[in-house]
Amino acid sequence: MNATVSTRETSVESTREASVEVWSPYVRLFHWSLVLCVAVAWLSSGEIMKVHELAGYSAGVLIASRLIAGLAGSGYTRFRQFVRGPRVVSSYLADVAHGDEKRYLGHNPAGGAMVLALLACVAGIALTGWMQTTDAWWGVAWVEDTHKILGNGVLVLIGLHVGGVLFASLRHHENLVRAMITGRKRAASPQDVG
């Protein structure tokens, strides 16, 4: 029995040593808070407008804080760590299609593009939602239409995001959902991109 306990303790200890913190407490709190805000806004849409508006304003504040952190933060929080150009994203997606993409410790190029798309979409939803509460923009058809289109668009992006997370989790044998909860990922190996 002592050998079993000892082996289990060694396994747990080696797992701790082989993982590194990637996602800061801020990034994790931002991520799950935005998930909550978007879910509440979507569920309350057309039903409980005060709740819908509060969720939208909260999402807008979260986006503003993420923009600041992306420019002034550190490590994997910074945009320059994961924002790549279209050629790099296309090349990465081609590598995915051929099954030879590299594992990234932070966001891979497709994940970075998705972060930007989600931030832009939620920012647009929050902005057009706010515009509808002002005298100048209330009842303006293109503002309402844009709000609805972006609201549906964010659902598509969320589906792609979740699909990408599940795909990458399976492909690289790594639970990325757990990583966004704990902040820790498997340490980079020599063939990974740190």
Model-derived segments and their meaning:
Residues 1-194:
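Membrane-embedded alpha-helical bundles that constitute the cytochrome b-like, heme-associated redox core
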